[in-house]
Amino acid sequence: MIPLSIRVPASTANVGPGFDSVGIALSLYLHVVVKEKSDKWQVIHSFEDSIPTDDKNLIVSTACKVCPSLSPHIIEVTSNIPLTRGLGSSASAIVAGIELANQLGKLNLTTDQKVQIATNFEGHPDNVAASILGGTVIGALDGKNVSVVRIESKELGVISLIPNEELNTDESRSVLPDVFPFHEAVKASAISNVLVAALCQKKWEVVGEMMERDHFHEPYRLELIPLLPSIRKCAKEFGAYGTALSGAGPSIFILTPYEKRQEIAEQLARVFTSMKVCELEIDHRGITVNKKEHIGL
């Protein structure tokens, strides 16, 4: 029997113009299983060698920052969230670390506290809030204060096109401008406002239109993801609502009518053969914890 297990969903961020604010939880998952106490932290995983197996692992280091008095444990980590592909892999690790500290340290953190802590670590609420809450989230970080609203989007299907190449978030952010002209900011924020209103009112065609009209980041990142325009064109022809970069990229995120997601995914897979086409769903549960026979930890 598993003593303690934690499951954290992947996430996509921005949804076009909702830069560092809008996030959606996805049906790819990071799992953490706590095995037993140990004299030092040990992380069992089958990822690449660059992922630490000790207290330098992001999950463990996050947990120890949240609760420095934690006793070391052996944990096993598995995940089908692609690394450095714009699907919230680091955010899911941060969220898992916070929950690990919460459970082992008996901190009794509220959901709002978890979102606040995770946002402070990540620097923006979109990915981490989606992974904690599930569904679609709209968040804002003002200084140290985080405000998040969660909405349901059960009528939507999701497709992700994942390239073989990695793209580091820092590299993707390096192409963004340091200064944004006032008139461009007005235009960009208006589009983002309509996106959020359309999400809340379930006006999916408007959502699709707005998510393809971003001015904040996608125009600058096109040089790093040159296939985006052709994928966007094909997806629309196949019946999708809209297409955008997933987070900082390089993955592409597509919203579809729920009942058409499989058909559209199959059509895209036939065209873009160099990319992995994943038919996904929006995760509506967020982080989950299984504490069966969690004794003596």
UniProtKB/Swiss-Prot annotation:
Gene3D superfamilies: 3.30.230.10, GHMP kinase, C-terminal domain (3.30.70.890)
Record flagged with keyword Iron: no
Assigned keywords, A-Z: Amino-acid biosynthesis, ATP-binding, Cytoplasm, Kinase, Nucleotide-binding, Threonine biosynthesis, Transferase
Keyword Ribonucleoprotein: no
EC number(s) stated in the UniProt entry for this protein: 2.7.1.39
Broad class of where this protein is predominantly found: cytoplasm
Cell compartments where the protein resides: Cytoplasm
PROSITE patterns linked: GHMP_KINASES_ATP (PS00627)
Reaction equation(s) it catalyzes: L-homoserine + ATP = O-phospho-L-homoserine + ADP + H(+)
GO molecular function, one term: ATP binding
UniProt-annotated binding residues for ATP: 82-92
Pathway, per record: Amino-acid biosynthesis; L-threonine biosynthesis; L-threonine from L-aspartate: step 4/5
GO term, biological process aspect, one: threonine biosynthetic process
A cellular component annotation (GO) from this entry: cytoplasm
SUPFAM superfamilies in UniProt: GHMP Kinase, C-terminal domain, Ribosomal protein S5 domain 2-like
Purpose of the protein: Catalyzes the ATP-dependent phosphorylation of L-homoserine to L-homoserine phosphate.
Family affiliation: Belongs to the GHMP kinase family. Homoserine kinase subfamily.
Name the UniProt record assigns to this protein: Homoserine kinase
Organism of derivation: Bacillus cereus (strain ZK / E33L)
